[in-house]
Curated annotation (Swiss-Prot):
The gene is purM. Pfam families: AIRS (PF00586), AIRS_C (PF02769). It comes from Lactobacillus acidophilus (strain ATCC 700396 / NCK56 / N2 / NCFM). This is Phosphoribosylformylglycinamidine cyclo-ligase. Its main location: cytoplasm. The keyword ATP-binding applies. Keywords: ATP-binding, Cytoplasm, Ligase, Nucleotide-binding, Purine biosynthesis. The lineage of its organism: Bacteria, Bacillati, Bacillota, Bacilli, Lactobacillales. SUPFAM superfamilies: PurM C-terminal domain-like, PurM N-terminal domain-like. Signal peptide: none annotated. GO terms for cellular component: cytosol. One of its GO terms (molecular function) is ATP binding.
Length: 345
């Protein structure tokens, strides 16, 4: 045994992992990709895309403590989708098309089979979003992490014509708020969820509470975050929307006000979309207030679009073409003096 392996770092396992993920990476290749996995840096040729005034838009994020659920369940092949979704949906919210993605995995012990499952999910998320997986890093850090632990983060870069970029100045009073449903909890609020389920209550991930209609708690919590690129990017390129809010950490209360200026107020009609059973369950056993829920969770909505009255029918028609479910949940109005930027009533 070499001295580095004695210290807890198995370089051979790293080589094994690279060989396992090569076909996964190759399956995400798209126009503009240069080189292949194994170089010191990933390369992408923007000229091939034919933009007139290109602006690059970057985003980075992780999966948070949802990873602890995946590790407890020994199910590691979906959290990579979450990682990509958290990044590319943010890039989309600026009006950009995701181009390429890089991942970072830190672990206590490099188990090539397990980490290849993680990258399998990353590659799937890249395919769903049209991103090329052009690089990544796996850092084996004994003593920093327990052998069964890993962390996952990602970095997305997208592109937009300068004139297509979305900013808060575009939204206007009278804009309709069109919401696209989430698939579940997505990747935020898991510290509160874990406290409610495992500290305040003795819930098992294998439990099947009546509210979840036959699904286990673990299965429900691990449902991957939705990726909205296919449904929404055409709306951006047709200049049909004024803003996109990705409902992530901080829920509605924090994220929706980011897409309009301080002189506007979002009035949300609670009950204008069907709730998801997982949120009813968490609210009940966690004894959570509405404020707790809307400050923490997506409450069944993953993305909100601000759309002018002139374009709302065209947006709905395009979403129907993509077989995308949507709900009209409210409007932007002039903000009364001294009032909050968002009201849920």
């Amino acid at each position: 045994m070499n001295r580095y392996k004695e210290a807890g770092v198995d370089v051979t396992a790293g080589y094994d992992l690279v060989n396992r993920i090569k076909p996964l990476v190759a399956a995400t290749k798209r126009k503009g990709v240069m080189g292949s996995i194994g170089s010191f840096g990933g390369m992408f040729d923007l000229e091939e895309l034919g933009y007139k005034h290109p602006v690059l838009v970057s985003g980075t994020d992780g999966v948070g403590t949802k990873l602890m659920i995946a590790q407890k369940m020994h199910k590691n092949d979906t959290v990579g989708i979450d990682c990509v979704a958290m990044c590319v949906n943010d890039v989309l919210a600026q009006g950009a098309e995701p181009l390429f993605f890089l991942d970072y995995i830190a672990c206590g012990h490099n188990d090539p089979e397990r980490l290849a499952d993680v990258v399998k999910g990353v590659a799937e998320g890249c395919k769903q979003s049209g991103s090329a997986l052009i690089g990544g890093e796996t850092a084996e850090m004994p003593d920093m992490y327990e052998p069964h632990e890993y962390d996952l983060a990602g970095f997305s870069t997208g592109i937009a014509e300068k004139e297509d970029l979305l900013s808060s100045s575009l939204a206007k009073a009278g804009d309709h708020l069109i919401a696209l449903p989430s698939s579940g909890v997505h990747s935020n609020g898991f510290s509160l969820i874990r406290k409610i389920l495992f500290k305040d209550h003795d819930v098992s991930l294998d439990d099947k509470p009546a509210e979840l209609s036959g699904k286990t708690v673990g299965e429900t919590l691990l449902t991957p975050t939705r990726i909205y690129i296919k449904a929404v990017l055409p709306l951006v390129k047709k200049h049909l929307i004024h803003g996109i809010a990705h409902i992530t950490g901080g829920g509605f209360i924090e994220n929706l006000p980011r897409i309009y200026d301080d002189n506007l107020q979002a009035v949300i009609n609670k009950g204008s979309w069907p709730g998801l059973p997982i949120f009813d369950y968490l609210k009940k056993i966690g004894v959570l207030s509405d404020q707790d829920c809307y400050n923490t969770f997506n409450m069944g909505i993953g993305l909100v679009l601000a759309v002018s009255s002139e374009n709302v029918d065209a947006v709905k028609e395009q979403l129907n073409t993509e077989n995308e479910e949507f709900y009209e949940i409210g409007k932007l109005t002039a903000r009364p003096a001294g009032k909050a930027k968002i009201v849920i009533e």
